[in-house]
């Protein structure tokens, strides 16, 4: 909630089974469905109103930024089934990646090392290391110096 300091949130997630590294800042309004299915590395920044829908494991590497309003969703329903049964796959966001404002990461996706998912993107397939997903296209980017 609004009265829970950002540096206290990692501690609370650990109590409920998350693995959270050192130097992690979690802003207000972040939602985590199943804390025991969330792992966050060191020195990460999780922006306001980020939503981890983690029916399956979500692993966030170190030095990752997940910007405001992003949704990281490891499960959904099989629309081809009359009963809409649930189907889920794990998600990995590797070290140094940046998931920008209002991006949506779907089940089974890996975001590569030091890669960028641009604002508003819907990530349906994995993004390789040192790449940028922008307007649905994956472009190579230089490694950080």
Report each predicted region and the residues it spans:
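Conserved acidic
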Residues: 4, 8, 16, 36, ...
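Extended, small-residue-rich solenoid/repeat segments and analogous flexible loops
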Residues: 1-33
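Left-handed beta-helix
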Residues: 22, 27-28, 33-34, 41-42, ...
